[in-house]
Amino acid sequence: MSKRRIAPLTFLRRLLLRILAALAVFWGGGIALFSVVPVPFSAVMAERQISAWLGGEFGYVAHSDWVSMADISPWMGLAVITAEDQKFPEHWGFDVPAIEKALAHNERNESRIRGASTLSQQTAKNLFLWDGRSWVRKGLEAGLTLGIETVWSKKRILTVYLNIAEFGDGIFGVEAAAQRYFHKPASRLSVSEAALLAAVLPNPLRYKANAPSGYVRSRQAWIMRQMRQLGGESFMTRNQLN
């Protein structure tokens, strides 16, 4: 008796479901593991490293030094919250009003796309996913964001974010950035230094902390004003983030 042939669409559907199931197990395990274990590298770091090698840049090294929140200046945590996600302590991974505003803006200005990703979303993307703006990646990002918001504390999310965020070419994490740009550990970053590092986060490969443009300087000044308005270090203590 000949075996029944499986229709191509059925085969592809089953294959896709198996791949998604495997990814769910992999990512779920990663979320559980990295809730307590330092993150050795991120998907973005791996992507940058592989791209460099494929381009013949064999001297490129995606560098990161993991540090705990106790070894990071409270100004640094406050600076990235101020710059990227001021509602970070309040939401469950998504800033819905900001998303609605971004969608309305993008409909009117297709040439200048505005994002509304929270720190939680950026952490999920940087840690587990590839660069890009596809709806598939956005969907996966949403699921991963819910995962880390459910399993991790806000302090843990911020700690991981600060250790894997890209601050320049091959520079990942606030410790590597502090050593490269200011020749000091992240624990000793001042208000202005923290604000400068946060100011380049929209595009750290375009904006340079070691050669800040007028835009970066104005953004740095805005971040410092906003940090004061949020309450300075007391904001971090009040929200159990340091």
Curated annotation (Swiss-Prot):
The reactions it catalyses are:
[GlcNAc-(1->4)-Mur2Ac(oyl-L-Ala-gamma-D-Glu-L-Lys-D-Ala-D-Ala)](n)-di-trans,octa-cis-undecaprenyl diphosphate + beta-D-GlcNAc-(1->4)-Mur2Ac(oyl-L-Ala-gamma-D-Glu-L-Lys-D-Ala-D-Ala)-di-trans,octa-cis-undecaprenyl diphosphate = [GlcNAc-(1->4)-Mur2Ac(oyl-L-Ala-gamma-D-Glu-L-Lys-D-Ala-D-Ala)](n+1)-di-trans,octa-cis-undecaprenyl diphosphate + di-trans,octa-cis-undecaprenyl diphosphate + H(+)
- Report whether Transmembrane shows up as a keyword of the record: yes
Q: Looking at its record, which EC class is this enzyme? A: transferase
Q: Name one GO molecular function term.
A: peptidoglycan glycosyltransferase activity
Q: How does it sit in the membrane?
A: Single-pass membrane protein
Transmembrane stretches in the record are 19-39
**SUPFAM superfamilies assigned:** Lysozyme-like (SSF53955)
Recorded metabolic or biological pathway in which this protein acts: Cell wall biogenesis; peptidoglycan biosynthesis
This chain's protein is named Biosynthetic peptidoglycan transglycosylase
User: What organism is this sequence from?
Assistant: Salmonella paratyphi A (strain AKU_12601)
Origin organism lineage? Bacteria, Pseudomonadati, Pseudomonadota, Gammaproteobacteria, Enterobacterales
